[in-house]
């Protein structure tokens, strides 16, 4: 019985030692090596691997030379892996930590772009037959974020793309509100129908 306890203790010590060695190895990896590894993986489109290297920079060198760029790159790699919620959170974090960064417009732009795709039902719902049940919450959030981006950075390199997305989103949201208004009108819910129509007139006056 004593041997079993001894084996358990030794196993625990061994596992603890492995964990400590892993942490030490990670901390001992130079920041520049981690950054170069991340860039190499981005170039080869290994975005998951790139995210791992960037996380290691953020964890081991939070105030390092490459920390700021690593956090910016995390916005991109999360976006490319389809992890839009994480990309949005990374953009918000970057804006909060580096409001004076020369590329801050990119973070604001990506906030809008991630919202554009984050709602998995955004495009499938656009085709649904039950028009009044479309959920355009994600579209509205994306519309608001991209509008904020255009107001803040009208000279940004990303303006043209943001505007094209806004046209699509505006038409999508207006179509949803109009279909919902008709749906409520047919069922005699006149107040609800009026509210939907008023929303379009007030917020989307130039919708085609």
Map each language-model feature to its residues.
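Acidic, polar-rich low-complexity tracts and alpha-helical solenoid repeat scaffolds
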Residues: 2, 17-208
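Bacterial N-terminal signal peptides
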Residues: 7-14
């Amino acid at each position: 019985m004593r041997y079993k306890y001894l084996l358990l203790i030794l196993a625990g010590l061994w596992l603890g030692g492995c964990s400590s060695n892993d942490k030490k190895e990670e901390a001992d990896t130079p920041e520049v090596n981690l950054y170069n590894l991340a860039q190499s993986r981005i170039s080869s489109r290994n975005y998951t691997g790139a995210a791992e290297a960037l996380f290691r920079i953020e964890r081991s060198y939070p105030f390092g030379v490459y920390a700021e760029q690593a956090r910016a790159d995390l916005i991109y790699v999360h976006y490319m892996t389809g992890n839009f919620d994480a990309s949005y959170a990374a953009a918000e974090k970057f804006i909060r930590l580096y409001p004076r960064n020369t590329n801050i417009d990119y973070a604001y732009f990506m906030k809008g772009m991630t919202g554009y795709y984050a709602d998995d039902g955004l495009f499938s719902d656009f085709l649904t037959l039950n028009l009044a049940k479309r959920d355009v919450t994600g579209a509205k959030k994306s519309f608001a974020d991209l509008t904020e981006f255009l107001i803040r950075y009208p000279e940004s390199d990303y303006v043209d793309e943001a505007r094209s997305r806004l046209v699509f989103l505006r038409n999508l949201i207006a179509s949803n509100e109009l279909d919902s208004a008709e749906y409520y009108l047919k069922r005699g819910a006149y107040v609800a129908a009026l509210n939907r129509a008023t929303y379009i007139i007030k917020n989307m006056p130039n919708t085609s």
